[in-house]
Amino acid sequence: MPEHEPTDSQQSSDTVLMMIEAAARSGSWNMATDEYLLEAALSGGLKAVRMYRWEQPTVSLGYFQDSDDEALSTTFQKLAAVRRLSGGGAILHHHELTYSFVIPADDPLTQLPTELYGRVHKAIIDVLRDFGADCS
C-alpha cells in the first residue's frame, strides 16, 4: 500500500492512515470494520480513510431508516442487507469501490466540512493515481 505523507499545510498530528483492502468482504464485515474505526477515532484520536469492496450485492440501510419499509422489502428482498452507522437512505453496493473516513469529533476539520471532504477526496485521488488510475 502506498504511503502518503502529510502536506506542508498539515502538522504531523494530521497524519491519516490510508487503508486499502484487497479482498472484497461481506456487508457485515465492512460495517463492523467501519464501526471499529469509528470507535478508535472517538477513543484514541485515529484519523483514517478506508477503501473497500463488497463480495456480493448488498443493500446498506441508513442508521434511522425503517427496515420494514414495504418498498424496500420488495425491491431488495433477495439481497444481503446491513445497517450503516451513518444516516441517509438505502444504497445498493456491488462492483464498486466504497470509502469511509473517520476523524476525532474534536478535530478542527469537523467545523470545515468543505475542506475536510476536499482533503479526503484528494487523498483518495492520490492513492488511485499511485495504482495507475487516470483520475482528477
Predicted regions and their residues:
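Active-site loop/lid in soluble adenylation, ligation, and acyl-transfer enzymes
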Residues: 2-72, 83-84, 134
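A glycine-rich, hydrophobic loop/mini-helix early in the fold
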Residues: 69-109
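Short, surface-exposed, polar/charged, turn-prone segments marking secondary-structure boundaries
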Residues: 48, 78-80, 89-90, 112-113, ...
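Generic secretory/membrane-interface signal
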Residues: 1-2, 78
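Hydrophobic alpha-helical segments and their boundary regions
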Residues: 51, 76-77, 121
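Contiguous, small/hydrophobic- and glycine-enriched helical/loop subdomains that border
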Residues: 98-136
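Catalytic-loop motifs flanking and including active-site residues across diverse enzymes
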Residues: 33, 95, 120
